[in-house]
Amino acid sequence: MKSVESLTEAEAAEELTRLADEIAAHDIRYYREDAPTISDAAYDALRRRNDELEAAFPHLIRENSPSLRIGAARAEQFAPVEHGVPMLSLDNAFSDADALEFDARVKRFLRLDEEVAYTAEPKIDGLSCSIRYENGRLVRAATRGDGRVGEDVTANVRTIGEIPQKLHGQAWPEVIEIRGEVYLGHAEFAALNEAAASAGQKTYANPRNAAAGSLRQIDPKITAQRPLRFFAYAWGFVSAPFAQTQWEALQALKAWGFRTTPQSRCVKGAEGLMEAYREMEAERPHLGFDIDGVVYKVDRLEWQQRLGFVSRAPRWGIARKFPAEQARTVLEAIDIQVGRTGALTPVARLTPVTVGGVVVTNATLHNADEIARLDVRVGDTVVLQRAGDVIPQILRVIPEERPKDSVPYDFPHVCPCPLRTEVVRETTASGAETVVRRCSGEFACPFQRINHLLHFVSRRAFDIEGLGEKQLTAFFERGWIKAPADIFRLHEKRDELLAMERMGETSVGNLLANIEARRTIGLDRFIYGLGIRHIGETTATVMARGYGTAAHFLEAMDKVAARDPEAVEELDALDQIGGAVIEAAAAFFGEDHNRAMVEDLAGQLTILDAEKPKTDTAVAGKTVVFTGALERMTRDEAKAQAERLGAKVSGSVSKKTDIVVAGPGAGSKLKTAAELGIQVLTEDEWLEMVGS
């Protein structure tokens, strides 16, 4: 990566655009989907790079800059709640120097020579929540959302025992928004995951994801079953002042019935900030819940008001982040996992070690090249890190502790499946080798088959509830389900199902009913469910609309496999279809066993024709962007409606955009549309235009 100083303006603009898109995608995964894919440290590095570029090229700051945005927009399944006072985030500090500079900035701004009093509070790693009380009674609760508009989770919050339905005492303001963190302790998290695993359900990667997923359930009864906890630490809108300092406010929150972090303390000056950080870092492993830093706040509220805010964060507070926790352990073995498409992934099996309050027993090694780079071997003592307290990874080997009989790891040349088929290294179209090694056995490989079946029943494919990894593996090992079509013959095994442990009349009946409900399926889901490489959800939808019927699709794929020029040209002409998709489709349908599997499956189903996009509507051929909160339909419904009417839906506004449909909470996209002179419609105007 080039240094900021060496970048041209064009290079900086290009990188800022990429960073904005990348950070926005990670914000959605973290705040809305509760499923982050990178570590906190990696995310912070992206933001720091963005900030450095904007500092060097301030004229390139865009409306959608991550430095001007908080969190992610609310999910459509929750009603919008506008916060009385925005829920802002804090700037981060990563070193003593950063924290000292924060103290110096505060003193410069306030023109003080005296030491400033601060509160130092543990930064809880959970889901931020704002709870509104009127006349002492809980009336509404919302997630952070994008900082201005959050998600209504009132019914779910009412099920959390540590959140009072009525404030204690009497000295509370008439209206107040209490802010805090919903979280799960380590013991509760372990129990929740153990119960989920026993029931064959998906487990959570960490307590933060579990807390967020539990709070954002559609059914409050599910939330009520989760042992969620809550720490209060701040407030938003308040009808009358109730404290003169942050410390006094924390004591008031306790008096009103909330739990506050017992580790919080009041400190003086820069020395106090350093001492509080060191003490909390030492206490961290013993707390029983996750914290990822220390929050410093100017204690005196009058000074907080004077300091005010800059961009998306207050001047009076900062979050001093902990480095990712590390631990030493022994690599006992390297196992090879085989994915749905045959990719071999090495997994390190470790002597159990506690990192960040979680017992870690394995870590991904990614690929053969990574093993070679680390020169990691069985028996090595390694330094392990739960990166961002999310994904365990091996940082390095401690060579001086390596056993004398150690030998370099030899990546397998045959698949670990019973067939022992050859492993081949993937190459690009130009012939260059990639890091991926694949089993050449395809569906003959049982490991690929079980992962293919898991993809087939997944939510975005056939969405068969009750068929998780545990159940599918058990049915596969018994020989009942070897291919997708076998799922629809499972009713023939009803007696055998009832004889299985934990499979009573109700659970068997529900499972078979769920399977029957998926005998009728849309062509797009059918195509996606086949699990063909490079054919994801969007591509499957494009292909379904392009071919219209299952018969046309299957006939065309046979011809593509035979390299029929007209069939290949027809596929290539579809929007977003390129060479990788054509090659993958040809390879898949060129295998007799794949073709037999597809025909067997199609014989069990009623595959609905895809609805052809219309060409004679007011929006046919136009590019539409939906932004803000939609009140009469979900975002997915709006997208599907627009595409049925022949429009193309985009996630960003550009010169190619024809229409922007803006609801409450529309932000930078609306401003960009105005600057570019793009037609802007309300939701009602859009529905009137399309005749709905």
UniProtKB/Swiss-Prot annotation:
Presence of the UniProt keyword Repeat in the record: no
EC number: 6.5.1.2
CDD domains recorded: BRCT_DNA_ligase_like, LIGANc
Cofactor(s) for this UniProt protein: Mg(2+); Mn(2+)
Single biological process term from Gene Ontology: DNA replication
Coiled coil: none
Listed SUPFAM superfamilies: BRCT domain, DNA ligase/mRNA capping enzyme, catalytic domain, Nucleic acid-binding proteins, RuvA domain 2-like
Gene Ontology MF: a single term: metal ion binding
PANTHER family cross-referenced by the UniProt entry: CHROMOSOME TRANSMISSION FIDELITY FACTOR 18, DNA LIGASE
Role: DNA ligase that catalyzes the formation of phosphodiester linkages between 5'-phosphoryl and 3'-hydroxyl groups in double-stranded DNA using NAD as a coenzyme and as the energy source for the reaction. It is essential for DNA replication and repair of damaged DNA.
Name of the protein in its database record: DNA ligase
Organism from which the protein derives: Phenylobacterium zucineum (strain HLK1)
UniProt lineage: Bacteria, Pseudomonadati, Pseudomonadota, Alphaproteobacteria, Caulobacterales
